[in-house]
Amino acid sequence: MLKVVEAFSGIGSQVEALKNIKIDYEVSATVDWEISAIYTYDILHNGKQNLKDYRLHHKESIVDKLTTYNLSSNGKDPITRRAMMAMPTVQLKSLLAAIERTNNLIDITSVNADQLPNDIDVLTYSFPCQDLSVSSFWHNNFSGITKGVGNKSGLLWEIERLLKDFSNKNKPFPKFLLMENVSAILSRHHIDNFNLWKKFLEDLGYYNQVYTLNSNKFNVAQDRQRTFMISVLCETPIIESNVDHYFSLNNLENVDLLKTKNISDYLRLDYDNNQYLHEAILATPNFTESRKKIMENNRILAVDRLANEHLNAATLTTKQDRNPNSGIIKFEKEVIKIGSQYRNLTPRECFLLMGFKENDFDTIIENDLEVLSGKKFLSNARLYKLTGNSIVVPVLEEIFKQINQINTEILKPTVSILQ
């Protein structure tokens, strides 16, 4: 069994990957402060909530509990008590239930070694990319993962703090660390800081394997390049040699899985299906001059009900009604909204392009909360953001296969794979 701790857990793409490849696992703790991610993670991986244990709580008592956590509704700023009091009681109860069911420690800046088990196999950390991304460059933000600047991407160094706490308390380090972020982390602006991070891990005894992987090589119709680092704790030189040899023979950058899926497997173009039609209408913007440019400048993934099967979606980001976006569906004969000439990808299609299953999305929608009359907690804007911030599941599947193989064949046995 792999015992996993997910820092910056999002909606749990790591757990989804482990489920898919049928590796026995246990999530000891998660860490995320954004409330829609917390709730979605819980519903996706633990199923429908039963709030009967919270039936005697009133709003004030629930808020008293929730305000002890550092929660956020936008991933940027903490929620105030006043804002919490404005939320429906059922939403507050559901949020508290989600925190407790996922053992969410919420605030990475306050997590310490005492809160985590002694036998962690894998600690994952997909820290925020805002200060590393290309968009930050265009806004003259070069702070990246510079230590001590107090930005979002700098939360990487909270993992350093946590590992130092492990050391100070003579607590065993996790066997594996798994990092994911944008590939700009390897750019000339950020490579020195990244090398500083790698050196810290090496000094603790970790062997670092860095991969830059594109999801289009993993049978996913999305062009999404991300950088991963698997860090393996090597307690002896022979183990380190064996791990190095393993990665030299099994480099995932050389993988190009047989393509059995194309964009038509992800698009929902059957508008005779009322649910697909409803979602498509919500993803169809009013046609304006700026949206004319969106239509002209972005990939046309389908025309009416016919997909362009040779195309992949561009990288999914946290918004679709923008330029550039991940691709559009153009209307020539199809009319789902008067005056419209195209639509964006729907949240369902985005979830599928990140490697989640359709019934995963249906589970989320079926368990969504009504926060106001006719207004759901998981709005389309929130769903787009959740998927844009996630990790492509089939890529993680191949990474976890490697972690599991190293764990069972190199770290646990004493027999060298070189023999």
Predicted regions and their residues:
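Core alpha/beta nucleotide-donor-binding catalytic domains of modification enzymes
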Residues: 2-173, 183-188, 192
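Amphipathic alpha-helical segments that form well-ordered structural scaffolds
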Residues: 17, 40, 158, 162, ...
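Short Gly/aromatic-enriched secondary-structure transition segments
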Residues: 44, 245, 331-334
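Short, flexible loop/turn segments with low-complexity composition
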Residues: 53-61, 244, 409-419
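Class I S-adenosyl-L-methionine
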Residues: 111-122, 132-322
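C-terminal target-recognition/interaction regions appended to catalytic cores
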Residues: 282-419
